[in-house]
Amino acid sequence: MSGKTVTRADLAESVFRKVGLSRTESAELVETVIDEICNAIVRGESVKLSSFATFQVRDKNERIGRNPKTGEEVPISPRRVMTFKASNVLKQRVLKAHLSRRAKQKQTGTAS
């Protein structure tokens, strides 16, 4: 793994380079897209980005859990959780990149 985290600024810079908007417009575009995704999720809507992923809010029922130290049963309150499900296209891209890196490591004799 590269260990790099892609930030909003990185996304805006990429839009700036690839689309040709100004840096300010690129940053505003990235913020608008993120805001729209967040607003839809807050409203309880699913956000499906084809070939990327689906973001959803799910309701979890109350259930009984267990304290791992004491073994005592503990009630877990009902709650809402957000889920991210990668598309098959994204999963395949990740797998292909992983296999490609491993093949290069074998050729050069390096391992991670």
UniProtKB/Swiss-Prot annotation:
PROSITE patterns from the UniProt entry: HISTONE_LIKE (PS00045)
One of the record's GO molecular function terms: structural constituent of chromatin
Coiled coil (residue ranges): none
NCBIfam families: himA, PRK00285.1
Protein name, entry field: Integration host factor subunit alpha
Record bears the keyword Transferase: no
A GO-annotated cellular component: cytosol
Role: This protein is one of the two subunits of integration host factor, a specific DNA-binding protein that functions in genetic recombination as well as in transcriptional and translational control.
Annotated InterPro entries: Hist_DNA-bd, Histone-like_DNA-bd_CS, IHF-like_DNA-bd_dom_sf, IHF_alpha
Signal sequence coordinates: none
The organism of origin for this protein: Sinorhizobium fredii (strain NBRC 101917 / NGR234)
Keywords (A to Z) from UniProt: DNA recombination, DNA-binding, Transcription, Transcription regulation, Translation regulation
Family recorded in the similarity comment: Belongs to the bacterial histone-like protein family.
A Gene Ontology BP annotation from the UniProt entry: positive regulation of metabolic process
